[in-house]
Amino acid sequence: MKNWACMIHSVKFIGILDTNVIYPIEIRDILFWFAHYDLFTPKWSKHIFEEWERVMIRKGITQVEAKKRSNIANQAFPDAFVENYENLIPNIELPDKDDKHVLAAAIKTNANVIVTNNLKDFPQDYLAKFSISAKSADDFIADIIDLNNEKAIMAFRELVMNRRNPNLDEYQVLDNLRKNGLTNSANYLHSLL
C-alpha cells in the first residue's frame, strides 16, 4: 500500500470522488474547496458524473440544471476528468458490479484513494492489489485537516464566505456537515476555529 499519509496534503495525492460524496452538496462543497486549496487532486469519470446527474434529477433538479452543475465542476477542475478506463472494467471484481467503473477510473489515473461512503463495496484487501485504498468522506476530510490545519481552515472559511442560498455562518455550516455524516470532520474544524 502507498504511504499516502505523507502525500495527502499535496496536489500529487489523487482521490477519486464517488457519486455519493459529490451529492449531497455539503460534502461536495468541502471536498471541492479543499481541492481548490491544493490539499488533494480530485478525479472523476463520465460514469460518476452521469450517475450524479441522475441523482440530481431524482431529487427534483432539472436535466438542464444537472448538466450545468456537472459542466461547472469540470470547468473548475479541468484535469479531474478521467478517460479511457472502460477497458479495465470487465477484469475488476467487486461485490457490486455497478461500482467497477469507479475502481477502473482510480486505476487509470493512479489514484491513491477512492473517497466513498459505500465502503462495503470496495474491499480494502482487493483495492490493495492496485495500491489504492477506500475512505469515507468523513475520514478522508478529517485526514486532510489533520495534515494541514492552516490550509484546511482557510478553505473552510472561504467555503462559508461563498455560501449562498441560504447564507450560513461557520457554525451553521458545521451543523450541516454533521447532518451529512461528516461528524468527525466538523468537530475537528470546530476545534480549530
Show the residue positions of the predicted features.
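Acidic, metal-binding active-site segment of PIN/NYN-like and related structure-specific nucleases
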Residues: 99-133
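Metal-dependent nucleic-acid phosphoesterase active-site entry motif
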Residues: 1-29
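Conserved beta-strand segments of alpha/beta enzyme cores
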Residues: 41, 81, 131-133
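Acidic, PIN/NYN-like endoribonuclease modules and their adjacent C-terminal/linker elements
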Residues: 120-193
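Acidic, metal-coordinating catalytic cores used for nucleic-acid/nucleotide bond scission
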Residues: 21-22, 90-98, 120-123
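Extended, non-globular alpha-helical segments
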Residues: 50, 54-77, 147-155, 162-163
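Active-site neighborhoods of divalent-metal-dependent phosphate/nucleic-acid chemistry enzymes
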Residues: 78-113, 147-149, 183-193
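PIN/NYN-family metal-dependent endoribonuclease catalytic core
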Residues: 25-59
